[in-house]
Amino acid sequence: AIDGLNVLNVQTILSEVGTDMSKWPTSKHFCAWLGLAPNNEISGGKPLRTDTKPVKSRANLAFRQAAQALANSKSALGAYYRHMRARFGPPVANVATAHKLARIVYAMLKTREPYHDPGADAYDAQQQAKLLRNLKRNARQLGLALVPLPPATSVADLGVFAT
């Protein structure tokens, strides 16, 4: 089961979409049809607008409603929603999470395999590793080296405020 998707949402999605995913070659086509894919219009290197395509689809609304329900979920999708909300705000986080849910549902219906949620802790660990990897890369580009601090019990143990 996917967190955020209740019985009513699943029924709405399946009644709109069906179970045959051969209509859409990839999940990108599926998400674009739903109106959940980013619509980046760029002219001369300048972004003009980055909204999603407006569509009248009950499945679109069901995915957005499911994404909103993930705000307090202790799953990887809930952690993703909270991460995006902190970076970009609630409206963008809602659409991004709905887009992710749509890709998961597409993959489930296409491959007929269940979804396995790794959990919020796994997502947070992945984000922490990504942050550390980027920090090391940036330090290397600046000609610096990262030195891990030994586990200290207090600030005085670090010798920063030596008297």
Residue ranges and their predicted role:
Residues 1-95, 117, 157:
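Phosphate-backbone recognition surface of nucleic-acid-processing proteins
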Residues 44-49, 81-163:
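Low-complexity, acidic/Ser/Thr- and charged residue-rich accessory regions of DNA metabolism proteins
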